[in-house]
Design a protein with these regions (language model features):
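Active-site-proximal beta-strand/loop segments in catalytic clefts of secreted hydrolases
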Residues: 48-52, 145, 149-150, 157-162, ...
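Secretory targeting signatures
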Residues: 1-27
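Loop/turn elements at helix/coil->beta-strand transitions in domains of secreted/extracellular proteins
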Residues: 42-46, 150-155, 171-176, 200-206, ...
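Extracellular S/T/G-rich loop segment that most often corresponds to the catalytic His/Ser-adjacent loop
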Residues: 105, 220-296
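Gly/Ser-rich catalytic serine loop of serine hydrolases
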Residues: 131-140, 213, 271-284
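C-terminal subdomain of the subtilisin-like protease fold in secreted/lumenal serine endopeptidases
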Residues: 173-177, 292-409
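Active-site core segment of subtilase-fold serine proteases
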Residues: 28-32, 36-140, 144, 153, ...
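Subtilisin-like peptidase catalytic core
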Residues: 51, 115-190, 235, 301, ...
Length: 409
């Protein structure tokens, strides 16, 4: 897409939600640390900002912990050695005195046995800092969607909506993903100042959820600002085939509406859940996988925006805008024949096929899922450049972007 000055266009990664003890076990001598860093290779850091997370779930378990050099560089102040036996409730209670009750706002906490680092985005958000609330679970599912798209993403989880700024300021974060906002995308201020800082000043990407109603996304503080990637919902694999569900109108792209995601109050449980809240972090995961692969190809073993680029080495300089534009070109329009007019399904009961005439009026640039990852990688490394979309699509999306720029300027 042809943008005006890209002052307001460096993407971030965010979430959209509805409207310890110091580790003495992770020790390396200096020689081990050097070897570990050399072996670690490329990585990405995704920052979901949401209700909380369940680090006990098997979905987040890793065979190796994050290395000490990484924790030091990230600014980790505390490591929680999580209990590995018992029910979810028993594990939480067993760890209260050594972990949960010790966490303060000033802490950056690593949960051993995972690649999850957490912090409080705002004080007093919940009774147990960072841990997902017993009556919620949104943040755990959101993070699960990131990991489904990129199992090797490092997670920096921020509990509470004010955590966007903390994620934006952290130099090692690549993508912020947010899945919260008022129902109906009513035009009120929200996190736009913090996401703009993350994208335009820090060079990150931000993915923001459009509303779950049919309201336009333009005025939505989470997904509407021009520097944010606004994401609506699309049923990728349902009983009725590929279906557009009711969710924010005029998004940047659409992604999978219904997913099977981890429970917030169990060790192994999963549930089907729907909404742009989960389409959004899935997109963040896809983008993080692309960034990680490009860093691997170019020998970039750092993270965050550096010198204006998310991939930065002697042979490469790829910005958040470059990645966003490539995503726009690689996204695809489903064929109307893939729709099966059966019984309505899912949380939204007005699912319809994607129009064969002007699909971009429903999907924006199109669907983003893991199948297009290699196309984006090969476009950005120059091995197989992508072309622009058809003139009608480019013109329509330019008009939507102009409206967003006008509204948020």
């Amino acid at each position: 897409m042809r943008f005006v000055s890209f002052q307001k266009f460096i993407p971030i990664v965010v979430f959209v939600m509805f409207s310890g003890c110091i580790d003495d076990g992770l020790k390396f001598n200096s020689e081990d640390e050097v070897v570990k860093k050399e072996e670690w290779g490329a990585f990405t850091v995704v920052a979901p900002v949401d209700t909380g997370i369940n680090p006990y779930h098997e979905h987040f378990k890793k065979n190796e912990s994050l290395p000490m050099w990484f924790l030091d560089e990230f600014g980790v102040t505390m490591t929680c050695e999580l209990t590995q036996t018992g029910t979810w409730e028993e594990r939480v209670e067993a760890d209260r005195e050594t972990c949960w009750n010790l966490i303060t706002y000033n802490d950056t906490v690593y949960f051993s046995g995972t690649w999850i680092i957490g912090a409080m985005g705002e004080e007093g958000w919940s009774e147990t800092p960072i841990l997902d609330d017993p009556d919620d679970g949104h943040g755990t599912a959101v993070t699960g969607a990131v990991i489904d798209a990129n199992p090797d993403a490092v997670i920096f989880f921020l509990e509470g909506f004010d955590g966007v700024r903390r994620a934006a300021e952290h130099p090692m974060v690549d993508i912020i993903t947010t899945s919260f906002g008022p129902i109906g995308s009513i035009p009120v201020s929200g996190i736009e100042d913090d996401t703009e800082y993350a994208v335009n000043e820090m060079g990150k990407l931000h993915t923001g959820a459009c509303d779950n109603t049919g309201s336009t996304c333009v005025q939505d503080a989470t997904g509407g600002p021009p520097w944010s990637i606004g994401i609506a919902g699309f049923q990728e694999d349902g009983d009725r085939g590929k279906v557009m569900h009711c969710s924010g109108t005029a998004p940047d792209i659409v992604a999978d509406w219904t997913q099977n995601l981890p429970d917030h109050d169990s060790i192994e449980g999963y549930h089907d859940t729907s909404g742009t809240s989960f389409a959004t972090p899935r997109t963040a995961g896809v983008l993080s996988l692309i960034i990680q692969e490009l860093r691997e190809q170019y020998g970039d073993e750092s993270s965050g925006g550096r010198n204006g680029s998310l991939i930065y080495s002697e042979n490469a300089s790829i910005t958040n805008y470059d990645i966003r534009r490539s995503m726009e070109k690689a996204s695809y329009f489903p064929d109307a024949t893939e729709y099966d007019p059966g019984a309505n399904e899912g949380a939204c009961q007005t699912g319809v096929p994607v129009s064969p005439v002007a699909p971009y009026t429903q999907t924006g640039w199109g669907v983003v899922d893991p199948t297009i990852s290699m196309m984006i990688i090969e476009d950005l490394n120059g091995s197989s450049p992508l072309t622009d979309k058809d003139f009608d699509c480019e013109t329509y999306m330019d008009s939507i972007m102009a409206a967003r720029i006008a509204y948020w300027s």
